[in-house]
């Protein structure tokens, strides 16, 4: 059985423009949220990635008419039916858990396979379950491969999340939009994607206040109508291209960004010494690489701190620094599966998954055969391949396609010597 690989001959400097897609982490929540609407919904600005296709297929399993055309999705829920969702689709996609909250909100009942996605170590959904129970749901976890969630009635509740969780904040919000009374989520996630989902639900007629703060208030409504909605730009894709530009960009303009959403990365790149100009009015950044950078320390935090999803993509830049850099991963301490692959390329890097720390020293990279263990590790290896001398072959590229629209095509257009092969 053959598989597609990405090959990169490093050493090229890149130049040109790239336009950022809609936010993956918004899209994977908003697509399930469409099933709460009674009527037709049109979403614009979707990223063209495999996760979107999987979620559209899950909508179709509920007898929803869903037409995906490029960046636009049209959904008609008029003939929706509740049905168990198949494991083979659900287990491939972590964000399929948003179907739980949406189906609970719509039907007060769902049977769904246990979600999959990138292997980043423990990512329990206990906070989601806690929220569903507070709203009045009963959870049957007796089956090893699926979960049954059911409520006679959904009622508002005060819910304090034990840890800040984007997934739990959104999932509880989806389940609560039709609950009787008011639901208050304390210690809610503040990420732009949470705000985007709340704005979408409000466009359908929901009553949600406080999105973007640590306290979310949801006043239940009887029904939601259709709407047309534009998804925000993807701050992680934007950040990845900012790292690419800082690594190998003669001059790269990155269009369709929200400067506030990438502020933590922008500050860190400037600390490194990157030549970066951000134009908030035009929603773009212009970046020119330098031959060497200053060493820095990076600590991942919940928004508005440095995003865990950019910890891996920024790592290759640290090999260009003039001294050792230190990374502390506070969100997913096991998010260092890219380290051994970088070592195969000659990198001087050590990581400790128990403490969630890594030490990165100046290194020259050489092409090698490497394996993308997850989505952002794949982005890291692409940047490393662009920097390396010789040819780098990246396996498991399906992870990369889960989160980056046409990344090989975009890099070719910028001047990279990059291609795909079947092996």
From Swiss-Prot:
Name its pathway. Cell wall biogenesis; peptidoglycan biosynthesis
**Gene Ontology molecular functions:** UDP-N-acetylglucosamine 1-carboxyvinyltransferase activity
Q: Which domain of life is it from?
A: Bacteria
- Give the main localization category: cytoplasm
Q: Which InterPro entries match?
A: Enolpyruvate_Tfrase_dom, Enolpyruvate_Tfrase_sf, MurA_subfamily, RNA3'P_cycl/enolpyr_Trfase_a/b, UDP_GlcNAc_COvinyl_MurA
Query: Tell me, what does this protein do in biology?
Result: Cell wall formation. Adds enolpyruvyl to UDP-N-acetylglucosamine.
Q: What is this protein called?
A: UDP-N-acetylglucosamine 1-carboxyvinyltransferase 1
């Amino acid at each position: 059985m053959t598989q597609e690989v990405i090959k990169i001959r490093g050493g090229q400097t890149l130049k040109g423009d790239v336009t950022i897609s809609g936010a993956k982490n918004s899209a994977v929540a908003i697509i399930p949220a469409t099933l709460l609407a009674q009527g037709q919904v049109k979403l614009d600005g979707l990223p063209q990635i495999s996760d979107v296709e999987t979620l559209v297929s899950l909508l179709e399993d509920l007898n929803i008419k869903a037409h995906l055309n490029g960046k636009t999705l049209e959904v008609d829920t008029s003939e929706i039916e509740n049905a168990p969702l198949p494991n083979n689709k659900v287990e491939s996609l972590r964000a399929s858990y948003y179907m739980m909250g949406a189906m609970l909100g719509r039907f007060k009942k769902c049977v769904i396979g246990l979600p999959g996605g990138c292997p980043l170590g423990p990512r329990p959904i206990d906070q989601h379950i806690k929220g569903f129970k507070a709203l009045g749901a009963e959870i049957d976890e007796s089956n090893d491969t699926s979960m049954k969630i059911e409520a006679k009635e959904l009622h508002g509740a005060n819910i304090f999340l034990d840890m800040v969780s984007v997934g739990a904040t959104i999932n509880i919000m989806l389940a609560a939009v039709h609950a009787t009374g008011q639901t208050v989520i304390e210690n809610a996630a503040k990420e732009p994607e949470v705000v985007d989902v709340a704005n979408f639900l409000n466009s359908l007629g929901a009553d949600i206040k406080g999105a973007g703060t640590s306290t979310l208030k949801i006043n239940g409504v009887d029904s939601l109508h259709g709407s047309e909605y534009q998804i925000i730009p993807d701050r992680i894709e934007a950040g990845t291209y900012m790292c690419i530009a800082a690594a190998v960009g003669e001059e790269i303009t990155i269009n369709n960004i929200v400067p506030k959403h990438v502020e933590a990365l922008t500050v860190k790149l400037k600390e490194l010494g990157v030549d970066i100009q951000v134009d908030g009015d035009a929603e773009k950044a212009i970046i020119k690489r330098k031959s060497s950078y200053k060493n820095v320390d990076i600590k991942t935090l919940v928004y508005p701190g440095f995003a865990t999803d950019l910890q891996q993509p920024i790592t290759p830049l640290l090999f260009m620094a003039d001294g050792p850099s230190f990374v502390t991963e506070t969100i997913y301490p096991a998010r260092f599966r890219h380290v051994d692959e970088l070592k195969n390329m000659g990198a001087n890097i050590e990581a400790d998954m128990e403490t969630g720390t890594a030490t990165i020293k100046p290194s020259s990279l050489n092409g090698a055969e490497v394996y993308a263990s997850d989505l952002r590790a794949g982005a890291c290896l692409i940047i490393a391949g662009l920097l390396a001398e010789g040819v780098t072959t990246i396996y498991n590229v399906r992870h990369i396609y889960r989160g980056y629209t046409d990344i090989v095509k975009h890099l070719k257009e910028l001047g990279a010597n990059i291609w795909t092969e079947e092996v």
